[in-house]
Amino acid sequence: MASLTLRCDSTHLLPSRDVVKGTKPFGTSLVYPRIISKKFNVRMRVIPEEGDVFSSSKSNGSSMGIELQPDLVSFGTLAAEMIPTTMDSPEVEDEEFDLDRPTDGFASIPQAIEDIRHGKMVVVVDDEDRENEGDLIMAASLATPEAMAFVVKHGTGIVCVSMKGEDLERLELPLMVTRKDNEEKLRTAFTVSVDAKKGTSTGVSARDRAQTILTLASKDSKPEDFNRPGHIFPLRYREGGVLKRAGHTEASVDLTVLAGLEPVSVLCEIVDDDGSMARLPRLRQFAQENNLKLISIADLIRYRRKRERLVEFTAVAPIPTMWGPFKAHCFKSLLDGVEHIAMVKGEIGDGKDILVRVHAECITDDIFGNSSGGKQLAIAMRLIEENGRGVFVYLRGPESKGIDLSHKPRTYNTNSDQAEGVSFPVASREYGIGAQILRDLGVREMKVMTNNPAHYVGLKGYGLSISGKVPLITTP
């Protein structure tokens, strides 16, 4: 693939850049097929076949103009960093030279997209380094009674329909609980359940469920077309899809959009014959027996990040801190315009064994430091300074889980100040913005500073891996 390199003197920050927008496959300008850059003191690379989802750390600059090989620019995967003229920055090779190549034992994403387009189901595994749970997924607009009978026979019976927020709002389907009150393990965004009023009886049969799903998928449906509660469970899709949250909800809609269909999909977890959740070996056997494509969310992440981005680099500057000097790398979210900061210490080099902390913004903790969140921020920065090499990613705004200011003081009455949950760490499935930032900084293998025992899913899709975890010990 190609690379775009701009080298200018490093005496000024990036003043301006003109972007010619391209296609918008997911409703937001995530793909930039052409980039026209004015003079600025930044080195930029269009990274071959690279792109993005998680969080943490990551030539001298005489003016040379532009070196361009054009075939890669269409994917819009642009990384950029300000570089002092006195520093050398080694090129980081992409270990995953072909982001379209599926993981061994899995079908390719284009094969799955083609099946979705023709109304077939695919089996999607959430993360092969996690629990390997699999979902049956198909386009909601192509649902049939026969397909629903198959889903109910081989699934949990909880049939869900993943939808975008604007469609849920159009149908007046609110979340079952508010986001801050969502205690479900994976923070899946369930809305109230529904049945279609027309063409159904009890709502539970395969035919009735198919009718409800088709009604949900129809652009002509209205709020009054549904009974509440019912037997189909709509789920709210996170904008940005698997590049934002590495879950089945997002994967299912991404697949239907890539197939050129309405952004509404059916999904149901697969169970084994004994009623337990089917794991990867059994899922592979199940897919073969039923002639279904088996894909992983990690592969879908790789497929999308080759073509799209969620963040763009804006500037970098040296910043003195109470712990020592760092470089602040600023990135802007293309989803909501929120700017995030990566505080980098030392040289990323080969990207291995990097000490990393991903921290969600919390004003009361971070500024006033009265709870574990502020203490953990300070400890993480100190550890990075002592280590001489590391990255602290500070995710702002919506990335901090949308916690309102009134909610935080109420947590002080719960006696849970010692738990990391009070500091609102980023959910393990919602590292999309941070993962792209880390990848752009050159991070490949990291030691994550966290007190959270949860596994982080979807990292493989970004070429990221965790070599260890470092606890952040705070004192009362």
From Swiss-Prot:
Subcellular location(s) per record: Plastid, Chloroplast
Keyword annotations from UniProtKB, A to Z: Chloroplast, GTP-binding, Lyase, Magnesium, Metal-binding, Nucleotide-binding, Plastid, Riboflavin biosynthesis, Transit peptide
Tissue-specific expression: Expressed in leaves, shoots, roots, flowers and siliques.
Main location: plastid
Lineage: superkingdom: Eukaryota
GO biological process, one term: riboflavin biosynthetic process
Inactive GTP cyclohydrolase II as annotated region, ranges: 307-476
Region entry DHBP synthase, spans: 44-306
Residues noted as binding Mg(2+) 1 in the record, renumbered to the chain: E131
Pathway note: Cofactor biosynthesis; riboflavin biosynthesis; 2-hydroxy-3-oxobutyl phosphate from D-ribulose 5-phosphate: step 1/1
Site positions for Essential for DHBP synthase activity: H231, E269
Residues involved in D-ribulose 5-phosphate binding: R130, E131, D135, R245, A246, G247, H248, T249, E269
GO CC terms: chloroplast
GO molecular function, one term: 3,4-dihydroxy-2-butanone-4-phosphate synthase activity
Keyword Magnesium appears in the UniProt entry: yes
Alphabetized InterPro entries for the sequence: DHBP_synth_RibB-like_a/b_dom, DHBP_synthase_RibB, GTP_cyclohydro_II, RibA-like_sf
A family per Pfam: DHBP_synthase
Cofactor(s) annotated in UniProt: Mg(2+); Mn(2+)
Binding locations of GTP: R357, V358, H359, A360, E361, Q376, E399, S400, K401, T450
Protein name: Monofunctional riboflavin biosynthesis protein RIBA 2, chloroplastic
Origin species: Arabidopsis thaliana
Lineage of origin: Eukaryota, Viridiplantae, Streptophyta, Embryophyta, Tracheophyta
Annotated gene: RIBA2
